[in-house]
Amino acid sequence: MGDHLEKSQHALLNEGDENEMEIFGYRTQGCRKALCLIGSIFSLGMLPLVFYWRPAWRVWANCVPCSLQEADVVLLKTTDEFKIYSWKKVIWISLSALSSTSGLTPDHPLITDEGYIINRAIRKPDLKVRYIKVQKIRYVWNNLEGQFQKIGSLEDWLSSAKIHQKFGLGLTSEEQEIRRLICGPNAIDVEITPIWKLLIKEVLNPFYIFQLFSVCLWFSEDYKEYALAIILMSVISIALTVYDLRQQSVKLHHLVESHNSITVSVYERKAGAQDLESRLLVPGDLLILTGSRVQMPCDAILIDGSCVVDEGMLTGESIPVTKTPLSQTASSVPWKMQSEADPRRHVLFCGTEVIQAKAAGSGAVRAVVLQTGFNTAKGDLVRSILYPKPMNFKLYRDAIRFLLCLVGTATIGMVYTLCVYVLSGEPPEEVVRKALDVITIAVPPALPAALTTGIIYAQRRLKKKGIFCISPQRINVCGQLNLVCFDKTGTLTRGGLDPWGVVPCDQNGFQAVHSFASGKALPQGPLCAAMASCHSLILLDGTIQGDPLDLKMFEATKWEMTASGDDLHIKEMLAHTIVVKPTDMVGQVPAEGLAIVHQFPFSSALQRMTVIVQEMGGGRLAFMKGAPERVASFCQPDTVPTSFISELQIYTTQGFRVIALAYKKLEMDCPTTALMREKVESDLVFLGLLILENRLKEETKPVLEELISARIRTVMITGDNLQTAITVARKSGMVSEGQKVILVEANEATGSSSASISWKLVEEKKPGPFGSQDTYINIREEVPENGRDRSYHFALSGKSFHVISQYFSSLLPKILINGTIFARMSPGQKSSLVEEFQKLDYFVGMCGDGANDCGALKMAHVGISLSEQEASVASPFTSKTPNIECVPHLIKEGRAALVTSFCMFKYMALYSMIQYVGVLLLYWKTNSLSNYQFLFQDLAITTLIGVTMNLNGANPKLVPFRPAGRLISPPLLLSVVLNILLSLAMHIVGFILVQKQPWYIMDYHSVCPVRNESASALAASPSVPEKTRSNSTFASFENTTIWFLGTINCIFVALVFSKGKPFRQPTYTNYIFVLVLILQMGVCLFILFADIPEMHRRLDLLCTPVLWRVYILIMISSNFVVSLAVEKAIIENRALWIAVKRCFGYQSKSQYRIWQRNLANDSSWPPLNQTSYSDMQGVSYSNPVFESNEEQL
């Protein structure tokens, strides 16, 4: 409908963002509203219920389309594959109350700059603002541009100069009031949802509405026992769900409430500094930060001073981060684009803790409020919890489709029932009641709940192993994983790095290695000074805190650290400046100490950090450390040894982490704060290399071997050096012995030359300089005979990945099919890589330590965080054990949960069909099962089986294939259909045979004399003793036969469908389930063979000859044997299904399988020792299936 609306009636909200929505304008119409009200009354409340389930229908029924400018209601539709509708009322804010007190007039608003959204949102002359609130975010109507725009943040177009000029002196009280009214309070309010609201929301679930319908029907038929049982189970289920939701609400409320009531110091333009409650902050306010351990109540841009911040809540990184002020540059470029590095280094994020605030000189640490409330980084995190992206898992969709098939089956049964009972002359109310009964029998209300029981048990088992899950539906997805990406540092390797040695250099090249294991003191000089000062360590309460790498590097120098600012008398010294001094242990030194006066913090994008230090009694120096290639590029070429590349490879190929150091002397005439980073980081002198050990975790190699043996691809995504990554891949087993590694290098276009891509074979040579293997690049023109075998891996850097994506995108899927090592990857590139794998129809898992992996963890089908920080909320799974052992555990439990869901699906489907067939056969005789017979089957049999059947644990061994990912798959459908046919045949045979028995008498309901005689004796003697006549309207020989066949068959079907290996532990290990089956079978056999009249009367059964009871048992046993044989010999016969696929020429339609087949037949792939150039076309690869995401999850 929305597609036909004019442009003024339709727009995009959050265009280009992850939460992009279509928005449609509607105006409420009185007559339509009245008609809906009448319809609600006459439908007895069903119409409002339908509107509750279908929000779009409510809007279409009550409103008429109109332009967004005139709308009083808007309809929202997500643009993703789910197309979820919601509606919001348009709210008006009146500023007229402020006009008299603050001087606001239509012609002269206080916010005079036309570029500000607040000014454009005020409608003149009545001074009103209209807005909508969507997922806790306000969107105001921009009168000039004619669209709804997000409010609560500073405008993106602001330059750094504009921020300093406009907000550097604070806002006036009038501006604060206007912004406060329009932007709303600065609070992340997560109200504790009242129990009654949770209760109503849960009860209005379609599943419970269907149960309510069923219960009402059963009460009308005097089927009170089972109705009460269903009510009891539903009440318990609803109570548990409401309790769980309430606990989550309380937990989230307590998590955020502390940030809503903080007192902060705000500088107001006229009144000066004053204390203010954080709820009253607005974008543009000027914060004054004092003291330490300050909780940030909003996002703010640091404009003066520096701060050390703990951002663990956002990034999972427990290492303090240094924030630097936004420089005041005379440029109109937006401030985010103006910064060479990540603009986040200037931003203090809401929810983080300012450990230390250091003012520049005698001034104060100042920050301008950037975003408030749910617009902040923490607000976005909380919104991702409140409004998670729905899971479009295929299992759920297939279950819905099958439910519709059952509804179709029920419809056929209803028509059959109507015909039989109408022709029999039954009263109309009885006919309707019996027809409705068929629906509750054919469509089991417990099916959706049964599909989740396996997930619940799996979640409990994972919790015992220290793996926590915030998205239980993802457990089933774990069972489908066929590719897992791993971060390197802290995930595959140990998080801590130990200094191994340094390689100094001078004008003659690299010198001898200084090993820290020797115990000798590090030679004093610029290299030692660089290690002692080029870091982001801080001194807090007498303890050195910061990056473990920085800490290890500093400790290796044997220098000491103090915080001082008063006794040095150094110009431009910040308060509590960090000072590093040599101790007595290091002997004579050229300097008394160094004061770190300025930092250019480390950035993963820039791969370096720089500090400016002041020598005590000396000059000013700059020290840089970072990735060797990056540092060398900033140095004077003649100071970089000619053997730099080969020397670097010696260590990186051994798996060492290598950091380069450089320095330069600075002029004293320029203030430190005025020095540009570009000027400082130029013409440096190369000092040498710092070598650090980064060993594999003990668990890494066995886990990777287990995954590879299970044919699950493993991929490394790291920010570390490419050579180091290749070595770690070899040592960990990710690249097996004998497999080739092909280095893919791509370079951007420069000048007249096009972008290029080259392929080089990385080979091994032995022995290496430290008794280990070495690697080198094969640049020979000839290709070895085995160079083009199928066992190879591609390795490339983040830079090459970017160039390939931009200029050689048609090659990208080919590279990804065998791409294993991705080094020097930025956080954004990690997310992009995961998405590219998903486009190839891989089910992708991502395992990282949470530091720079949050984006990739969120993008993957299954994200596993090894961090216990709050940032693990970005990941569905969090492991308390900081190693990758959790990955195979998750996959095993996921496979087990998936198979369990299938088992329960099949069982519930068969259970309903068994009852359905039995009841329809009895309807032919205008009979049915009695209430107690239904109760016995529903409660004593099916409910107990449903609770215990899912208790099988996961198989401890990972097999090299996955369970079926769909309910609508040939083996599963064949299993269900064949078992339904077998049950149908058995019931029909029993129904017909019982009527052909010689003792079958229509007028009598019992053939059991005082002493049970044989059927032949009964046939020979028509004058049988006095027989008891039953008063029940249900008791008949057909009823007794059908009930026994159906009840015992339900037990046997559970045994047949309870799967064990290869994905679950054998059924006999599920002791509770086995015990339940034995007890149920014992009770059923007792009822079958015991002649207890009172028991028969209660269950509305008739006593039959013993031989007929044996016949019943033979029929059920035969059905069980055939069913078990079919299940084992056909359904679970993997070799048979593979042969059938080959016979019919079926091949997987997954994109990665198609590419694998194509590349296997391409003799020219992979290219070796070749260089290709871009034709500048850049044809991109697109997977239509992924784009629509119909089959993705």
Curated annotation (Swiss-Prot):
GO molecular function: ATP binding; ATP hydrolysis activity; metal ion binding; P-type calcium transporter activity
Cytoplasmic membrane side: 1-32, 54-198, 246-401, 459-901, 955-973, 1058-1071, 1127-1193
Catalytic activity entry: ATP + H2O = ADP + phosphate + H(+)
Expression sites by tissue: Expressed in brain and stomach.
Keywords for this protein: ATP-binding, Endosome, Magnesium, Membrane, Metal-binding, Nucleotide-binding, Translocase, Transmembrane, Transmembrane helix
GO BP term (any one): intracellular calcium ion homeostasis
Protein name per its UniProtKB record: Probable cation-transporting ATPase 13A4
Record organism: Mus musculus
